[in-house]
Amino acid sequence: MTQLSLNDPALSEQGNEDWLRFVALLQNSFAQDLHQPLMQLLLTPDERTALGTRVRIIQELMRGEMSQRELKNELGAGIATITRGSNSLKAATPALKQWLEQQLLGDAQ
């Protein structure tokens, strides 16, 4: 997959530097099998739960079997969170969408 831009226009210059430092740290943690303890160190239990919920939102939106309201009730997420997920998915590159489909829907999970 080609990377379009390393900079996130929603972040300040310092915010982008911090984000890229985090991404590099995360990549290195996977390479050294330290990703699980790193994420537990950096994220609270609530933040880890929220990330898991966001993955489920993307998965269910891609599956296309539930309305946003049904997702809200099923996952206990706010409608704004689901709408943000939907809008982000619409803005994702075709390559990312294809990769997500393989990862999240490939095994009929």
From Swiss-Prot:
GO cellular component, one term: cytoplasm
Keyword Transmembrane: no
Keyword Transcription regulation: yes
Keywords recorded for this protein, A-Z: Cytoplasm, DNA-binding, Repressor, Transcription, Transcription regulation
Residue spans crossing the bilayer: none
A GO molecular-function annotation: DNA-binding transcription factor activity
Subcellular location: Cytoplasm
Pfam families registered for this protein in UniProt: Trp_repressor
Reported function: This protein is an aporepressor. When complexed with L-tryptophan it binds the operator region of the trp operon (5'-ACTAGT-'3') and prevents the initiation of transcription. The complex also regulates trp repressor biosynthesis by binding to its regulatory region.
Protein name (database record): Trp operon repressor
